[in-house]
Swiss-Prot record:
A GO molecular function held by the record: structural constituent of ribosome
Name of this protein: Large ribosomal subunit protein bL17
Coiled coil (residue ranges): none
Family recorded in the similarity comment: Belongs to the bacterial ribosomal protein bL17 family.
Subunit note: Part of the 50S ribosomal subunit. Contacts protein L32.
BP GO annotations: translation
Keywords of the record: Ribonucleoprotein, Ribosomal protein
PANTHER family: LARGE RIBOSOMAL SUBUNIT PROTEIN BL17M (PTHR14413:SF16), RIBOSOMAL PROTEIN L17 (PTHR14413)
Pfam families: Ribosomal_L17
A cellular component annotation (GO) from this entry: cytosolic large ribosomal subunit
UniProt gene name: rplQ
InterPro entries, sorted: Ribosomal_bL17 (IPR000456), Ribosomal_bL17_CS (IPR047859), Ribosomal_bL17_sf (IPR036373)
RNA-binding in keyword set: no
Length: 142
């Protein structure tokens, strides 16, 4: 018997799970709504709520913790991308940087009054190929 087993396991290695959740979390913050399977969404909800709680603190330490959890990599631009940057603003080429800024500037301020439960999961029809339960996970409006 495996009592109190809280690990997220969907048939992948732990490093793959960690990277997959970080990428899904970045997509959720960027688009505020993604479609995925139900087990992934339930695990993603736990991490998303923790990130919003960090964003509500809005401190440098919280920002550094969020960068670590999101596995943000600040990549250097190629010379072509640097030339194409309008007005020298190179941040548009690094989505990870935009995600962290959106998390702390928009989402953190949106949920200041709310104590928890920042996301909702809406169930969809099962996927045709493998009958997996699909769902939409999204941030609440306010």
């Amino acid at each position: 018997m495996q009592h109190a087993r809280k690990k997220f396991r969907v048939g992948r290695t732990s490093s793959h799970n960690r990277c997959m959740l970080a990428n899904m979390l970045k997509s959720l913050i960027h688009y505020e709504r993604i479609e995925t399977t139900l087990p992934k969404a339930k695990e993603l909800r736990r991490h998303a709520d923790k990130m919003i709680t960090l964003a509500k603190k809005n401190s440098l330490a919280a920002r550094r913790i969020a960068i670590g959890r999101l596995m943000v990599r600040y990549n250097k631009l190629t010379s072509k991308e640097a030339r194409q940057a309008k007005g020298g603003d190179t941040s548009v080429y690094n989505v990870d940087r935009l995600v962290v800024n959106k998390l702390f500037d928009e989402l953190g301020n949106r949920f200041v009054e709310r104590k928890g439960g920042y996301t909702r999961i809406l169930k969809l029809q099962n996927r045709i190929g493998d009958n997996a339960q699909k769902c939409i996970i999204e941030f609440l409006a306010s």
